[in-house]
């Protein structure tokens, strides 16, 4: 019986291509694991009205963690238009399966390392080593949205907040509302995770990234909790930066920053910016981590035009495997894998098209496997 059970979730588009690359490396590492395929993605939305079928949720409950490829996600109207004819008009509403997974399994911490590996021609600078901690279950991604705005909701808002007076005479059909929900507990958890990581890995600083000068209540709560928790880690300085200024400073002086911690939407934005500084989404790995379960994935999309072409850069996926190995306490394997990836990048002999080369997804994975 295998030591680990890992849910294998290719998803959409290039998801299968990059997970095939991951399997080449995992086989070479000889991780004692059983890989169990699960249904997830756009075709299941179209055929079943659910991109994350209940059978897949039950599968995940029986596994140690998941490795996830990529997902196609479309706006409400487009999603409804692509439903099977037999499902149309029956009240099905598309929800991103990865967002749903994060909430169902309380995968509260989104860990996104963005490190410049020497030899990567796409590096903005070679001395960038950032780690983004993004709260993963709340904020504008909580899914509490209204359109049109129900009259009873409008009445409550008008009664309780003077700023709603501006919209008093606007037709309810002309108002869309998405609630930014932030809880004290979630703020505490993500900030503490960031500081614990900084302590364990001997990092220089933690920067909390918010917008409390405008979004006073929700961003303000995050800032206040960050200040409290920072007192428990006197050797690690806490910096505070507004999200707009953070984007500017990351372009100007990315080497000055170390660990960034923020709420869900700001984290989604700033982590993609950080990824571009170290080569783009082809190098952007992530872990969605909870107390007893985790899902690891590259942060790129499904890139359907490249699906099945064996063309895309698998390094983001291979680095996600590295994060998975760390989480499984297979630290030696994780270090070997990262060193092999770094060597392949530095040598520059095997590169996919985004790096100016012509190697295939498989060839990059095989070269990494050889370096193991």
Stretches with model-predicted labels:
Residues 46-163, 177, 265:
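N-terminal glycine-rich phosphate/adenylate-binding segment common to multiple enzyme folds
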Residues 12-15, 64, 133, 194, ...:
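Buried hydrophobic positions in well-ordered alpha/beta secondary-structure cores of metabolic enzymes
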Residues 32-57, 250:
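N-terminal beta-loop-helix "entrance" segment that forms/cooperates
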Residues 33-34, 201-210, 233-241, 330-338, ...:
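Flexible, glycine/charged-enriched surface loops at secondary-structure junctions
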Residues 54, 92, 247-349:
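Glycine-rich phosphate/nucleotide-binding loop
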Residues 2-6:
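Extreme N-terminal starter segment of soluble prokaryotic enzymes
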Residues 22, 26, 226, 317-325, ...:
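Buried hydrophobic packing segments
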